[in-house]
């Protein structure tokens, strides 16, 4: 039994010294402000890659916005064309409702595909 107490005392003493040595070490990891020249070059290369990536991202964004603006302009032109066609068809419908023959009857029938060109 005495042997066990001696061993447990030795273990507790060694554990205390290990805890004390760990506490003495302080912070782990690299010391701040001590970068080697390769680390500085790596950081510069990383920074340049980041800048290049940002430039490419801005260029892609600019192209995307240009494409969308062209798409909107094309759709607006299509809307204007459809509105003029709608107004023309409404006028033609009103003339037919009044039992009048439309002035450009043949042209309209050709456009609709009812009358074939001669």
Swiss-Prot record:
Biased composition regions of type Basic and acidic residues, renumbered to the chain: 36-53
Cellular component, GO, one term: nucleus
Primary location: nucleus
Compartmental location: Nucleus; Chromosome
Mutant phenotype after disruption: Sensitive to nutrient stress. Larvae display no obvious phenotype under normal feeding conditions; larval growth and development is normal, and there is no effect on triglyceride and glycogen levels. However when mutants pupate and become adults they display reduced triglyceride and glycogen stores leading to adults dying within 18 hours of starvation whereas controls survive 2.5 days without food. Larvae are also sensitive to nutrient stress displaying 50% lethality when fed a low nutrient diet.
InterPro entries xref list: bZIP (IPR004827), bZIP_sf (IPR046347), CREBL2/REPTOR-BP (IPR039250)
Residue ranges, annotated region (Basic motif): 40-77
Residue ranges, annotated region (Leucine-zipper): 82-89
An example Gene Ontology molecular-function term: protein homodimerization activity
One Pfam short name: bZIP_2
The protein's assembly and partners: Homodimer. Interacts (via C-terminus) with REPTOR (via C-terminus).
Protein name (record): REPTOR-binding partner
Organism lineage string: Eukaryota, Metazoa, Ecdysozoa, Arthropoda, Hexapoda
């Amino acid at each position: 039994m005495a042997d066990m107490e001696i061993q447990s005392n030795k273990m507790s003493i060694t554990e205390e010294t290990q805890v004390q040595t760990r506490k003495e070490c302080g912070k782990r990891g690299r010391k701040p402000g001590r970068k080697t020249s390769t680390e500085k070059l790596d950081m510069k290369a990383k920074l340049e890659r980041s800048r290049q990536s940002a430039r490419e991202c801005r260029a892609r964004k600019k192209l995307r916005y240009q494409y969308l603006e062209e798409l909107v302009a094309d759709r607006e032109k299509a809307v204007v064309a459809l509105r003029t066609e709608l107004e023309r068809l409404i006028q033609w419908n009103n003339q037919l409702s009044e039992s009048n023959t439309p002035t450009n009857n043949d042209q309209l029938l050709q456009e609709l595909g009812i009358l074939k060109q001669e």
